[in-house]
């Protein structure tokens, strides 16, 4: 089985970049292995539709992003099967969130969507550009980390901690990392 951890988001808009920042954090701090499965981590930025050729190569997809949820405050973490989204998830967030939803729906229509899970956190809405995470999203990082590690372990993946780099130290160079991929 091929497993993809896909970080989505716009690093120029604070919390909207949490998926990208978190995938960079995992890349720097963990080594994932399984004797039979391939595990890849990708910074998908705001590419959405352009990711389709990549996404079709995987059997199991975990999208890490912000999610909009009606009546829920910033910093709430959700982990769900894309086919069974909680009722409060309204997909009315940023442009990249809507595009990713459309991408997954298009892939489903043609039978190319892998089994998909969403690991999302509700963002603080900020209008001006700002590279960094708000305090509520930063406080949610351990919950996000625990959710992804538990899910991978359920799949039999070994999650080995190889570093202890803070997510905030990775943010200033996030835009460069996406270009290197």
Residue map of PLM features:
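Secondary-structure boundary/capping motif
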Residues: 1-2, 115
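Helix-loop-strand module that forms the ligand-binding subsite of alpha/beta enzymes
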Residues: 66-116
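A short, flexible beta-alpha/helix-coil linker loop
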Residues: 10-11, 85-87, 124-127
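Nucleotide and nucleotide-moiety/phosphate-recognizing core
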Residues: 3-6, 11-84
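Phosphate-binding/catalytic loops
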Residues: 100-181
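Residue-level signal for pocket-adjacent positions within structured domains
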Residues: 7, 72-75, 93, 128, ...
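Conserved active-site and cofactor/substrate-binding residues in soluble primary-metabolism enzymes
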Residues: 17, 21, 46, 95-101, ...
């Amino acid at each position: 089985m091929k497993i993809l951890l896909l970080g989505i988001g716009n690093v120029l808009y604070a919390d909207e970049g949490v998926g990208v920042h978190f995938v960079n954090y995992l890349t720097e701090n963990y080594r994932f292995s399984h004797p039979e499965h391939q595990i890849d981590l990708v910074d998908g930025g705001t590419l959405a539709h352009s990711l389709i050729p990549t996404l079709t190569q995987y059997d199991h997809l975990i999208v890490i992003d912000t999610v909009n949820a009606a009546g829920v405050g910033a910093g709430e973490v959700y982990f769900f099967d894309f086919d069974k989204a909680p009722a409060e998830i309204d997909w009315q967030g940023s442009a990249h969130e809507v595009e990713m939803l459309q991408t997954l729906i298009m892939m489903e229509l043609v039978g190319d969507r892998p089994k998909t899970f969403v690991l999302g956190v509700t963002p603080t809405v900020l209008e001006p550009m700002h590279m960094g995470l708000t305090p509520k999203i930063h406080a949610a990082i351990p919950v996000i980390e625990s959710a992804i590690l538990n899910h991978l372990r359920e799949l039999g993946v070994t999650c080995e901690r190889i570093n202890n780099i803070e997510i905030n130290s990775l943010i200033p160079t996030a835009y460069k990392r996406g270009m290197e991929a």
